[in-house]
């Protein structure tokens, strides 16, 4: 069913206002990378909280300079308050101590550094941390646990990446941000498509069918291939979903021990 994106904007703004108020906060903070998802969240937060919304720009030593430029341009266009904290000195220390660390380890370390900066700012300013992960990323587990997935509330967590693009157009996000390849900007040359093997335009229809057909049920790959999806695509995507499902769950806590 086609979404009414203007109504969606009103709904998400209402969600942000009510949930932040419900948790006893007046101010919010979020990470702004220069990418699409954080730009959308930033503009939504600015609409609702105005001067009580604040963005943190946290480039690493591997961040592309144009991403910072795009983030600053967004801040200027929408009058977004921001602070820049470079995490480059800290990821350099990690690199010097763990010279054999894989790109994934380095990327996860940077994501968790950013989380630490966000929550430190949250405490200092009495602000609530707002998440920027979309539904495609969440279903695929394409994020860092206690890193970029960490937040108090997330306005776009139920929107697939292709839907975030449509929402961004309605919010007048700059075309430079809209048109660049999605990337977590965790290491040089990284892109979502390289990591996932497919563009979101291919992945999202499959994710939508998986959610519609197999919610709270085991995924039947044969059913999906019968719908016309490529067998390798189905195998790769379902494998990711199953392997990373734990990232969407709260920690499992042992029940209270009652000796008989």
Curated annotation (Swiss-Prot):
Protein's name according to its UniProt entry: NH(3)-dependent NAD(+) synthetase
Presence of the UniProt keyword Ligase in the record: yes
Record EC number: 6.3.1.5
One BP term from GO: NAD biosynthetic process
Originating organism: Helicobacter pylori (strain HPAG1)
Quaternary structure and interacting proteins, as annotated: Homodimer.
Family recorded in the similarity comment: Belongs to the NAD synthetase family.
Function: Catalyzes the ATP-dependent amidation of deamido-NAD to form NAD. Uses ammonia as a nitrogen source.
Keyword Ligase listed: yes
Pathway assigned in UniProt: Cofactor biosynthesis; NAD(+) biosynthesis; NAD(+) from deamido-NAD(+) (ammonia route): step 1/1
Domain of life where this protein originates: Bacteria
Residues annotated for Mg(2+) binding in this entry: 37, 137
Reaction(s) the record says it catalyses: deamido-NAD(+) + NH4(+) + ATP = AMP + diphosphate + NAD(+) + H(+)
Alphabetized SUPFAM superfamilies for the sequence: Adenine nucleotide alpha hydrolases-like (SSF52402)
MF (Gene Ontology): ATP binding; glutaminase activity; metal ion binding; NAD+ synthase (glutamine-hydrolyzing) activity; NAD+ synthase activity
Annotated deamido-NAD(+) binding sites: 112
Pfam families listed in its UniProt record: NAD_synthase (PF02540)
UniProt-annotated binding residues for ATP: 31-38, 132, 161, 183
Enzyme class: ligase
Keywords: ATP-binding, Ligase, Magnesium, Metal-binding, NAD, Nucleotide-binding
GO cellular component: cytoplasm
């Amino acid at each position: 069913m086609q979404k009414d994106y203007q109504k969606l904007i009103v709904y998400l703004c209402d969600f942000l206002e009510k949930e932040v108020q419900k948790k006893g906060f007046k101010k919010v903070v979020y990470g702004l990378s220069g990418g699409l998802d954080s730009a959308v969240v930033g503009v939504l937060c600015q609409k609702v909280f105005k001067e009580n919304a604040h963005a943190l720009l946290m480039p690493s030593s591997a961040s592309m300079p144009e991403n910072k430029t795009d983030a600053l341009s967004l801040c200027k266009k929408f009058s977004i308050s921001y602070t820049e904290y470079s995490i480059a000195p800290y990821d350099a220390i990690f690199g010097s101590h763990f010279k054999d660390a894989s790109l994934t380890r380095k990327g996860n370390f940077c994501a968790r550094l950013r989380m630490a900066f966000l929550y430190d700012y949250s405490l200092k300013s009495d602000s609530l941390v707002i998440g920027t992960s979309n539904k495609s990323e969440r279903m695929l587990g394409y994020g860092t646990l206690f890193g970029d997935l960490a937040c108090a509330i997330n306005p776009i967590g139920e929107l697939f990446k292709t839907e975030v693009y449509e929402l961004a157009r309605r919010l007048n996000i700059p075309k430079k941000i809209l048109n660049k390849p999605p990337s977590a900007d965790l290491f040089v040359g990284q892109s979502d498509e390289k990591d996932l093997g497919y563009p979101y335009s291919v992945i999202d229809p499959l994710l939508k069918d998986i959610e519609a057909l197999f919610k709270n049920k085991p995924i039947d790959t044969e059913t999906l291939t019968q719908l016309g999806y490529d067998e390798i695509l189905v195998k790769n995507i379902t494998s990711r979903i199953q392997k990373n499902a734990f990232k969407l769950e709260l920690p499992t806590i042992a029940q209270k021990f009652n000796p008989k």
